[in-house]
């Protein structure tokens, strides 16, 4: 894989967007531009989901924390995903309260009910790397901009960008 010029650009301070672009799976980078990473408001819902899934895959296959790529890309993935998911969900979020784990647990039952527990949702660091990756991909699959006047939106989706970042962080420190 050829590296692009070393330039840090975009709204997430310290994130090298060119390195991020180069780190994404080709199934993602072949279908987006560098500008798509820097300006989430310009891309479709499907492209946002594609980028988020690419970031989860990039986090899952992270280098050692001593690798320069970890410092320029991977450690910034939680903030980047927070921003992208916020755009996907409509831009409004609530940083001051926690996600309703019980409500979120119910939402996950059709897809992850065979293994997900409330304990795992409260303590994502206790999950294996593949479990975290599966949960994050399911959040992306379920995410969409919806009316802000629903109870589910208030209890779960309004708070999801922060929760997503919290769940993604332990993935960056797991050996897979």
Curated annotation (Swiss-Prot):
**Highest taxon of source:** Viruses
Q: Does the keyword section mention Secreted?
A: no
Q: Which residues, by range, are in coiled-coil regions?
A: none
Query: Which terms are listed as keywords in the entry?
Result: Host cytoplasm
Q: Which GO terms describe its cellular component?
A: host cell cytoplasm
Which locations, inside or outside the cell, does it occupy?
Host cytoplasm
- Per the UniProt entry, the signal peptide is none
Primary site of residence: host cell
| Keyword presence, tRNA-binding | no
Would you identify the family this protein belongs to, as annotated? Belongs to the tenuiviruses NCP family.
Any idea what job this protein has? Answer: Induces the formation of large intracellular inclusion body, organized in amorphous and crystalline arrays. Presumably the main cause of the stripe disease observed in host.
Protein's name according to its UniProt entry: Major non-capsid protein
Q: Which organism is it from?
A: Maize stripe virus
């Amino acid at each position: 894989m050829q590296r692009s010029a070393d330039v840090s650009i975009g709204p997430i301070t310290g994130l090298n967007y060119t390195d991020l672009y180069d780190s994404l799976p080709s199934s993602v980078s072949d279908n987006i531009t560098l500008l798509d990473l820097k300006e989430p408001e310009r891309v479709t819902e499907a492209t946002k989901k594609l980028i988020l899934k690419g970031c989860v895959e990039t986090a899952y296959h992270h280098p050692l924390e001593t690798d320069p790529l970890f410092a320029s890309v991977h450690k910034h993935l939680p903030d980047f995903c927070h921003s992208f998911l916020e755009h996907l969900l409509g831009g409004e979020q609530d940083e001051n309260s926690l996600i309703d784990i019980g409500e979120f647990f119910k939402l996950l039952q059709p897809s992850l009910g065979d293994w997900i527990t409330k304990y795992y949702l409260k303590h994502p660091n206790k999950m294996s790397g593949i479990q975290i990756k599966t949960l994050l991909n399911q959040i992306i699959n379920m995410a969409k901009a919806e009316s802000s006047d629903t109870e589910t939106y208030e209890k779960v989706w309004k708070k999801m960008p922060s929760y997503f970042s919290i769940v993604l962080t332990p993935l960056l420190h797991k050996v897979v």
